[in-house]
């Protein structure tokens, strides 16, 4: 018989680095009632984290204020009670701030909490680490992927041959699909952004310019392996797979394409329409909408 009393990390860094932090405890091995052997302990290692304490405080306060303002200004929506912030050092790519709300105090679990309190935290989502587990459509920040694609592959709106070429963004674009997709898409800015090139389109967040790129991809490559060129660029930037941060239970997010829609039609038919992957899905994808999801750390 051996006696081994261990403190086990249940979540976060403590769980990820459990073996390093815990070390090896002293073990007393008995044979009957006699001590047969004492195995000396090995102390756990220290770990150094990259979080900036002051920035962490500022980020937490900012997120709380942002959620409060959102709730004050959008009365018709459900209450916003969840949020995440991730800040990376642009030179080292280390996480210098990470906030997930709602949260909880792990010290309360040292002596145990009531089932009622546990259920309240669980229902509120306090045990979720939203920076790495929350999966949401990334929205217009995804246009950076399309920008990179356009630069590298020289794929521009129809009629343009360089990044300096301009289109007239009038606020909507008619696609003329014959596959059942939506025919007219309206930009977020009524009336459009005027004459824009690639640089201006990312600065102004012009949907129409990027829809034009998606339309060219669809017309040139539909049904070929190159049809998913945008998705491949997204995956090369880390979308659709874990970031490999040293935290447990990281989500992957989703980068949708024709093959995934075919898989879903069998395994999760409620997620897709019977027609499968259409041109309109690519239009949604290029502006970070539709079936695509990403975690905050992937976006960061």
Task: Write out the residue ranges for each language-model feature.
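N-terminal leader/targeting segments and the immediately adjacent pre-domain N-terminus
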Residues: 22, 43-67, 100
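Amphipathic, well-packed alpha-helical segments that form the structural scaffold of globular domains
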Residues: 18, 22-25, 33, 60-68, ...
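Beta-lactamase-like hydrolase cores
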Residues: 57-84, 103
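Small/polar-residue-rich segments within soluble enzyme cores
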Residues: 1-44
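Beta-lactam-recognizing serine transpeptidase/beta-lactamase-like catalytic domain environment
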Residues: 26-42, 51, 77, 83-86, ...
